[in-house]
């Protein structure tokens, strides 16, 4: 079986420090912002949780604050925990407190999950409503569609991977990784708490123009090595993109990748 990574011209860049990775992520994001704002007047960005938000802090530096057209950004989440939006486990809260509240992106351009579903812990309804939200924005031409498939195509997704090789809330051994019809699905038995989550499906993730997967620390090294050794039991091994899928790794995360890969 040919590697998905080979098919998509996936790249990996290994950075000596997290600081250098963060700086490179900021530059990469800012360059794509300039490209898409000029070409189409919008920049659709998909966030994940975890350490990613702290690495985005480089975009708070004056050179980016002053040059980025923040009013043209539209923010989404590749996955979300179905908890109240002010809960400590909320990816929305993490992103808002650490990044979104510090940049002038219009609040109307930020798309968290439905607050009532979040408060009630209703994962199924939260997934359905988020999918409806995406479809409305496709109809308004804020989100593009991928070629003939009709799936939404985001400009940039900033992703992370767990030590078990999960990305978004697509976990090894769970059926959600095989979902191909829906844009957004849900899980109520996540192996990582909290158990209720919604997540983009794999086709939506892989339709993005640019996917940047940022992974740091030795705890992730085994999973990173398996991904680059084409172990498709790991959801992250299926990552691709329309234009570019790129992995930003620190030295610890990359330490077990077989030579030549």
From Swiss-Prot:
A biological process term (GO) from this entry: pentose-phosphate shunt
Catalysed reactions listed for this entry: 6-phospho-D-glucono-1,5-lactone + H2O = 6-phospho-D-gluconate + H(+)
Entry EC no(s): 3.1.1.31
Domain of life the protein comes from: Eukaryota
Any one GO molecular function term: 6-phosphogluconolactonase activity
Record's subcellular location: Cytoplasm, Cytosol
Classification via InterPro entries: 6-phosphogluconolactonase_DevB, Glc/Gal-6P_isomerase, NagB/RpiA_transferase-like, PGLS
Keyword entries, A-Z: Cytoplasm, Hydrolase
GO CC term (a single one): vesicle
Pathway info: Carbohydrate degradation; pentose phosphate pathway; D-ribulose 5-phosphate from D-glucose 6-phosphate (oxidative stage): step 2/3
Family the UniProt entry places it in: Belongs to the glucosamine/galactosamine-6-phosphate isomerase family. 6-phosphogluconolactonase subfamily.
Entry function: Catalyzes the hydrolysis of 6-phosphogluconolactone to 6-phosphogluconate.
NCBIfam families: pgl
Name of the protein in question: Probable 6-phosphogluconolactonase 4
Gene name tied to this protein: PGL4
């Amino acid at each position: 079986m040919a590697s998905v990574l080979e098919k998509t011209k996936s790249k990996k860049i290994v950075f000596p420090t997290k600081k250098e990775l963060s700086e490179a992520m900021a530059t990469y994001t800012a360059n794509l912002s300039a490209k898409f704002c000029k070409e189409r007047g919008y920049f659709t960005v998909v966030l994940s949780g975890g350490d990613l938000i702290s690495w985005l802090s480089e975009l708070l530096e004056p050179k980016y604050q002053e040059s980025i057209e923040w009013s043209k950004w539209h923010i989404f989440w590749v996955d979300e925990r179905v908890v109240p939006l002010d809960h400590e486990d909320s990816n929305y809260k993490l992103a808002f407190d650490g990044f979104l509240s510090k940049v002038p992106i219009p609040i109307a351009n930020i798309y968290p999950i439905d607050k009532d579903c979040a408060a009630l812990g209703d994962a199924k309804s939260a997934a359905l409503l988020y999918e409806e939200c995406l479809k409305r924005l496709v109809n308004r031409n804020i989100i593009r569609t991928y070629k003939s498939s009709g799936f939404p195509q985001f400009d940039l997704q900033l992703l992370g991977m767990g030590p078990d090789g999960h990305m978004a809330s697509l976990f090894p051994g769970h059926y959600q990784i095989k979902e191909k019809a829906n844009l957004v699905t849900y899980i109520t038995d996540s192996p990582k708490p909290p158990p209720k989550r919604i997540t983009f499906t794999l086709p939506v993730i892989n339709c993005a123009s640019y996917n940047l997967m940022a992974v740091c620390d030795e705890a992730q090294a085994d999973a990173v090595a398996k991904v680059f050794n084409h172990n498709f039991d790991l959801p992250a091994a299926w990552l691709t993109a329309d234009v570019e899928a790129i992995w930003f790794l620190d030295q610890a995360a990359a330490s077990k990748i077989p030579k030549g890969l």
